[in-house]
Design a protein with these regions (language model features):
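Mid/C-terminal beta-alpha module of Rossmann-like enzyme folds, strongest
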Residues: 229-294, 299-300, 310, 316-393
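NAD(P)H-binding glycine-rich loop region in Rossmannoid oxidoreductase-like domains
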Residues: 60-113
């Protein structure tokens, strides 16, 4: 009788398959889901490394609703085990920074293969038992959004920055999952995640961000809550089959300068002006924006804790997981007594081989200089801190035209209206979900992918990166590109830019 009751209780639970549970967002999501043992059965897929086994062993003992599948996202059979019988798939896993920044081939292999495996496994399920799929995309898909275009929304052009193979794989994986024929899906594009370990990041990539660039950050706790909330049965039907931006709200809309100030203050370090040169930072070709549609996801899922941002940074600095040295520095502010010593360490990082911005300048690495500064002349024209504008970015959004009547449901648009949208992208709509770009490539894509997701021709999609040329034939894309680039620019970045990065 007891076994029958247990089976009945289990039958009522939602079965979740989560990838990426040992990563920052995935772990937060796992811990949030495990708080509701009466509602969920949780399966996770994790590589059988010693580190993962040590991390997950205590949880496996504490939580009877947790089932660990030891395997690999790039192996279809392992993914199929997790997907089979699940009610919802949360695909969070893949290679991310900092590993992804140094391993382009491995990043492409892992992230794209994982998306293909998840899609194949979901489509292999009986149609009446096909799980919902939530894909975690990235703000990196949207590329460089400098002023005055630092406000954006889902449906804006996909525009992955040159050298950003991670962003490229996230865009490709999003297309694979959301345009595959899966019945019920959602793509949630993650921003920068605030979590305690970010306070100890020390990497030359820290200088790849423009000082006046922006991000609408998401806290790790909000991100974890989001993953649990999207699994609830009360999520309405109209939520699904759409694209969303993840952020913790207006309080977390920061310029990169404001972020540096908050971070450095939290760990007791001097201000940016005392420990960095302004020209160590790039002036373009990163990613990040504030969200015009940022509250849309919150209105559906109610995942934000709305902790004041200064308070949140103070909390991070007190996190038990931080190294003792950082906690000591945060408490004593001792580094503020030795700004020159801190600057020496930062100078060393800016001059790091291959990825240091000053290494590019010293060795005249022209593709990097053109991508991240425009030209050597533009680099030399960067003002010092005394003359640098670090004021808060404009709070007035500039709305990009998506080329169709957005008051209408995209599924109700006529062929003529779709052709108008295609013409705005330099192409044609040929009917039956078939499109043609300005270069004559013909491709299949759903109207949701094109109009709500901001994707376009897969044959024109990098690499090579040739956005200067795309802007000349695609008015939709030109809205984003032309205001930020000189018309004479004609940069093309092929796969050769990654030569020598990895074996």
């Amino acid at each position: 009788m007891k076994n029958e009751v247990n089976r009945a209780q289990r039958a009522k639970k939602t079965c979740i398959f989560l990838t990426g549970a040992t990563g920052t967002m995935g772990y937060a999501g796992m811990m949030e889901i495990l708080r509701y043992p009466d509602q969920y059965e949780l399966r996770i897929l994790a590589r059988p490394s010693q580190k993962n086994k040590e991390l997950l062993a205590p949880l496996n003992l504490q939580h009877s609703t947790l089932n660990i599948i030891w395997g690999d996202l790039t192996k279809y059979e392992d993914v199929l085990k997790g997907v089979t019988g699940a009610d919802i798939v949360l695909h969070v896993g893949g290679m991310v920074s900092p590993q992804a920044d140094y391993r382009p081939k491995a990043t492409r292999r892992t992230n794209i293969t994982a998306a293909e495996n998840v899609t194949k496994a979901v489509l292999a399920q009986p149609e009446d038992h096909q799980p919902k799929v939530v894909y975690i995309g990235s703000v990196a898909q949207m590329g460089d959004r400098r002023e005055p275009l630092h406000w954006g929304r889902a449906g804006d052009p996909i525009c992955v920055s040159a050298y950003d193979h991670y962003g490229l794989t996230k865009a490709q994986a999003e297309r694979i999952i959301t345009d595959s024929g899966i019945k019920t899906w959602a793509s949630l594009r993650q921003s920068g995640i605030l979590y305690p370990a970010i306070l100890k990041n020390y990497d030359p990539i820290m200088f790849h961000v423009p000082i006046r660039g922006v991000l609408e950050w998401a806290t790790v706790e909000d991100s974890g809550r989001l993953l649990e909330r999207v699994c609830r049965p009360e999520v309405p039907a109209e939520f699904w089959n759409n694209y969303y931006n993840i952020g913790s709200g207006a309080e977390y809309r920061l310029s990169n300068y404001e972020f540096e100030c908050l971070l450095l203050d939290a760990i007791g370090c001097p201000k940016p002006e005392q420990i960095f040169n302004a020209n160590w930072f790039t002036t373009r070709n990163f990613h990040g924006m504030w969200y015009i549609d940022g509250d849309k996801l919150e209105n559906y899922l109610h995942f934000r804790a709305n902790v004041p941002v200064k308070e949140y940074f103070a909390r991070m600095a007190k996190a038990p997981s931080l190294p003792a040295g950082i906690k000591f520095a945060a408490k004593t502010h001792i580094a503020k007594l030795f700004p020159h010593c801190v600057k020496l360490a930062m100078r060393f990082m800016a001059n790091s081989k291959e990825h240091g911005t000053q290494w590019w300048i010293k060795h005249n690495i022209e593709p990097r200089i053109h991508a991240y500064y425009g030209s050597l002349e533009e680099y030399k024209a960067i003002p010092d801190w005394k003359h640098f504008d670090v004021s808060h970015n404009s709070e007035t959004p500039v709305l990009l035209d998506h080329g169709y009547d957005e008051s209408k449901d995209v599924d109700s648009l006529t062929d003529a209206e779709l052709n108008k949208a295609a013409a705005f992208r330099g192409g044609k709509y040929l009917g039956n979900d078939t499109w043609q770009c300005a270069q004559g490539h013909t491709f299949k894509a759903s109207r949701r992918l094109i109009l709500l997701g901001g994707h376009w021709c897969p044959d024109c999609f990098p690499m090579p990166w040739a956005w200067d040329r795309e802007a000349k034939r695609n008015p939709f894309f030109a809205q984003l590109w032309a205001p930020l680039h000189d018309p004479s620019e004609d940069n093309v970045y092929g796969p050769e830019i990654f030569d020598g990065w990895e074996k």
